[in-house]
Structure formats: C-alpha cells, structure tokens
Design a protein with these regions (language model features):
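Active-site nucleotide/adenylate-binding loops and adjacent lid/helix of ATP-dependent enzymes
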Residues: 1-101, 136-156
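A short beta-strand motif that forms the metal-chelation/ATP-contact edge
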Residues: 22-24, 67-68, 181-192
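Active-site-proximal flexible loops/turns
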Residues: 31, 64, 181, 194, ...
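A short glycine-rich, hydrophobically flanked beta-strand micro-motif that places a catalytic Asp/Glu
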Residues: 67, 161-180
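ATP-dependent carboxylate/phosphate-activation module, predominantly the ATP-grasp catalytic core
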Residues: 68-158, 189-220
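Conserved active-site beta-strand-loop modules that form the wall/rim of enzyme catalytic pockets
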Residues: 95, 173-174, 181-186
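Cysteine/selenocysteine-centered motifs that mediate thiol-based redox chemistry or coordinate metal-sulfur cofactors
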Residues: 217-236
Length: 236
C-alpha cells in the first residue's frame, strides 16, 4: 500500500512470473505495446527489451479512471489532512471532477473468441490500445474509499522531498474495482488525462461544486486566483 492506495504487486525479475501479469511500457503510450504474460516464456516472446517496462500483477475487475483536482488555495470543501510534519494541517481542497473508462482494441472483445492459449496458437495477440473514453459513474458506496485514496495520494506527495509543495491541480487515479468491491490503483497520472475530454460541459461529480465545470476550466480558475497576491500562500 502506498499513499493510502492498494496497488497490484510489481515483479522486479521476469523469472518470478508464475501467474497472469501485464507488462507495460513507460510513458503515455495509450496502452500501445502492453501485453499479458503467464510465465517467463510468454514474457520473452513479447517484450521489447529496448524499452523501459514494468511487470505488474494482472488484476481482474472493471477499470475506472478517477479524475481529481487538488486546490491548495481553497480553505473550504473536502480538506486534505496533512501527515508527518504536516500533521494537523489542512493542505487544500480535494474535488472529484469526473470519471471514465477506456475502450481498448482489441482486448475488450477478445474473450468472445476463446482462451488466450488458443488465440495465440492461431497467431492472435490481445492489445490494449486506447481508442476512446466513456463517461462513468460508480456505486455511491465506493465514493468514500475513492476520496480516501485520493487524499492519501495528495498528502503523501507533500512528503516526497524536503520543501515539496505537493501535487497541485489535476491528477488521475487509474484503478481496478474487483468483484469484492475493492480498489486496486495500478497507476497515478499527475496531470490532466484524455479521459476528461467527455466532460467539457461538466459531470455529475463536478456539478456538485459548480455547474458546467470541466477540468480545463478548473485549472483556469485556480490559475486566475493564484495571480492575486493576497490569496497565495504556500506556507504550511
């Protein structure tokens, strides 16, 4: 667990692969080149050793991408509680702006054709190339846990290094929700993500704070306020 998030197991040595894993390449590649391996042989057959990669436990479930925003200037709303040397201090407001899931070619339809072994014998390999984004709302009972994870992520970012100002603005928790209704966070993107594109007119989540609030407008809003000297203070 890191920053309050439960994460899939990461393997450092491909020889340790003894069950389904997903191999991902570094950078925002839209899923291109990712592949599933069940053992070292699978890994060697598909890996591009010239690229930096991560081997991660493959978790079955629904993938949801949670778009949050952290505003260090706001003193109202859901306040992130500091930890460590920031314990007892409010660091700023956390907002859930929107949520999406990704359409991926061709893994979303692969299961209809048979087992992975059979398909590979036929020369077919699943791919995870992102082709689109769909708006999502999740079960309300999952929202408290979503905020706990996001709050822990922001609080932990203030402790990454001395004098750190933490993670400011938009970020995305890339998650899997299992059939036991548990979150696994497989990646954190400290930026605006493409999944926010369906919400240029706002979302059911952002409308709680202000109607028609997109991630882009939220960035513009806090940037505008930060230019007013009387409102800017990073002292903790």
């Amino acid at each position: 667990m890191a920053g309050g998030c439960t994460m899939p197991k990461v393997l450092e040595d491909p020889h340790d692969i003894d069950g389904p894993v997903i191999v991902k390449y570094a950078g925002a590649k839209g899923g291109r080149g990712y592949f599933i391996a069940r053992d070292y042989r699978d890994f060697r057959r598909n890996v591009d050793i010239e690229e930096e990669f991560t081997i991660q436990e493959y978790v079955l479930g629904c993938r949801y991408y949670l778009h949050f925003f952290f505003d260090p200037l706001a003193t109202d709303g859901y306040q992130v509680q500091g930890r460590g040397k920031f314990a007892g201090k409010n660091l700023g407001r956390l907002e859930l702006l929107s949520m999406d899931r990704r359409d991926e070619a061709n893994v979303d339809e692969f299961y209809k054709l048979g087992s992975l072994r059979d398909l590979r014998e036929a020369g077919m390999e699943p791919s995870f190339v992102v082709t689109g984004n769909q708006p999502v709302v999740i079960r309300e009972s999952l929202l408290p846990r979503a905020f706990e994870m996001a709050e822990g992520t922001v609080a932990a970012s203030f402790e990454l290094e001395d004098e750190s100002r933490g993670m400011i603005g938009p970020f995305c928790l890339e998650t899997i929700v299992t059939d036991s209704l548990e979150f696994k966070v497989f990646e954190i993107s400290a930026r605006i993500v493409a999944g926010s594109n369906p919400f240029v007119g706002g979302s059911p989540y952002s409308d709680i704070n202000e109607t028609r609030m997109s991630t882009g407008r939220r960035i513009a809003s806090v940037t505008s306020r930060s230019r007013r000297p009387s409102t800017v203070s990073f002292e903790r």
